[in-house]
């Protein structure tokens, strides 16, 4: 599972739209869309904000090993 899919899945679990997530992060809906589609890598402060918001460690969302482990499941 790629980072973009992890964020999309976490957002969907909570029933949040891209706009709702964007509002909580203080970014545009287009930024959330770009992250979810892999067109944009979030800045470090934004990555930490995403992890905090979803109550996950940054490694759970953005770590390459996490992606490989989830893809193998």
Residue ranges of predicted features:
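DNA major-groove recognition helix of helix-turn-helix/homeodomain DNA-binding modules
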Residues: 45-60
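Short linear/disordered segments characteristic of secreted peptide precursors
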Residues: 8, 42, 65-68
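Short, charged recognition helix plus adjacent turn
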Residues: 52, 62-73
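Recognition helix of helix-turn-helix/homeodomain-like DNA-binding domains
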Residues: 27-40
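Short basic helix-loop element that most often maps to the first helix and adjoining turn
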Residues: 5-24
